[in-house]
Amino acid sequence: MQLFWVIFLFYLMICFVNVACLEPITTFGVITGGSAALAALGFNYNTIKLNTYCRWYECCTPDYIPMNMKQLKEELEQTIFGQHIAIDVVSKALNYHYKNLEKSSKPLVMSFQGTSGIGKTTVSNVMKRAIYKKGMDSKFVHKFNGRVSFTLVDRANVYKEQLLKTVRDAVKDCPLSLFVFDEVDKMPPGILEGITSTLDHGESNDNIDFTKAVFIFISNAGGLEISQHLATLMRRGESREDTQLHHFEKLTELSMYNSNGALEKSGTIENALIDHFIPFLPLEQRHVKKCIEQEFQRIGMPYPSKERLDAVLNSVTYEKENEFFAVHGCKKLEKKVGLVAAND
């Protein structure tokens, strides 16, 4: 009994000590050791972990994964311009997925497609901040880049095995993991075939539950087709803001299937494992202007003069066939704004 009280007092000390004065490794060892000792005496391990380790280290718990869908919608509307379809679909799809986790039979899988500089990566970053307390720094966010992560085509089979192991280990650690595959069109063909089963069944032979996870594929595939189709609709007199997902979804699916990269002729598409093919529309001058104003505000100039705005706008290149669409969207504006701001 005396041993019990010694350990109990030790537990209280861990709960209330000011860990700022301890080294991280020392703190981790003390917490882990104390938790193990209490668990051995019959205390619930998860309760102990929640009140010790998880007070200072990120855990797969609601405190660290708030899934703040209100924040998601508000930040998307404030920071993303000209993407009413993406904002609507992403917000609703994530909200439904997280509200129905116990009923879900597969992970949520979305494909973000469109030309560069129009918000695809930014939307994924907003998602990270809304879902996880630590945002982009969360250990439950896993990002892969086609130009960096999988550079050698002849190692595709090795990458495929490594990727499957990474995904399995991540979901085993936290079922609410987020996987973002950027520049999918730059990845070797077939590399995503290894994780096809995780996108479909939801549960592997090792009883790893994938149904709560979210997978995002980001690509430029279909960008030209999206621009041409939107231009056609607008020339017919249809409003850009009245376009909906169904106007573009089949087009984006086919373009991804026929494009170069990891999803070329992929079983992921053939087996209908991607839930939503989300088109990101090309930006017009009015959208680019909002990006410029936002960038001026970010650098501490919330009220730029008309001359400054025009100076940046004049540097924007527009498509030859569809002259109202900016070629690079908002991608190159940061340095352009910086150059104009420096001319005082």
What are the roles of these predicted feature ranges?
Residues 2, 23-41, 126-129, 268-271, ...:
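C-terminal alpha-helical "lid" subdomain
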Residues 2-5, 11, 15-70:
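Extended, charged/polar low-complexity intrinsically disordered regions
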Residues 219-221, 235-268, 275-288:
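Conserved AAA+ ATPase "SRH/arginine-finger" region at the nucleotide-binding site
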Residues 168-169, 190-216, 220-224, 231-240:
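Conserved catalytic/switch belt of AAA+ P-loop NTPases
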Residues 68-108:
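Pre-Walker A (pre-P-loop) alpha-helix and adjacent loop at the N terminus of AAA/AAA+ ATPase modules
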Residues 106-139:
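Walker A/P-loop
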Residues 138-174:
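Short glycine-rich substrate-engagement loop in P-loop NTPases that contacts/grips substrate
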Residues 182-183:
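Walker B catalytic acidic pair
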